[in-house]
A protein has these predicted regions:
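Hydrophobic helix-and-loop "lid/oligomerization" segment in the mid-to-C-terminal part
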Residues: 1-91, 96-124
Length: 124
């Protein structure tokens, strides 16, 4: 998990952490296309970023929203214990495993976040 990162990737990581929102054991972070431009990075550079918020003791589910295009997000979900985030991903046409899953949502960020939170809260 801890390899050698470029300065741009580290800058991107800091920007992503600055978007952190926590509520009810759910941590949400967001990556925008502008962040990639500002840090000269690419979507490959966000690999594992979804894992970091889950390190916090009170976080049961970590969700990363990566902007693909206007009003379209790739969602990565990670969970602890018996919380099956694959069910959340499947509700949006995605899939995965119990503790690691993903999907795509065509909506603005606030709408996408609200839709994901409804599904995640139903599991916690």
């Amino acid at each position: 998990l801890f390899e050698s990162w470029s300065g741009g990737r580290f800058d991107l990581f800091m920007k992503v952490l600055n978007t952190l929102q926590k509520e009810d054991g759910i941590a949400i972070v967001q990556v925008t296309r502008r962040m990639f431009e500002e840090t000269s990075t690419s979507p490959d550079d966000v690999e594992h970023f979804v894992e970091f918020p889950r390190i916090m003791k009170d976080v049961k589910v970590s969700v990363l929203f990566r902007e693909i295009e206007d009003n379209c997000y790739k969602i990565s979900l990670r969970s602890k214990d018996d919380i099956n985030v694959a069910r959340v991903a499947e509700a949006f046409g995605g899939g995965g495993h119990k503790n690691a899953a993903g999907c795509r949502i065509k909506a603005d960020f606030e709408t996408a976040k609200k839709e994901i939170l409804v599904k995640v809260r139903a599991l916690t």
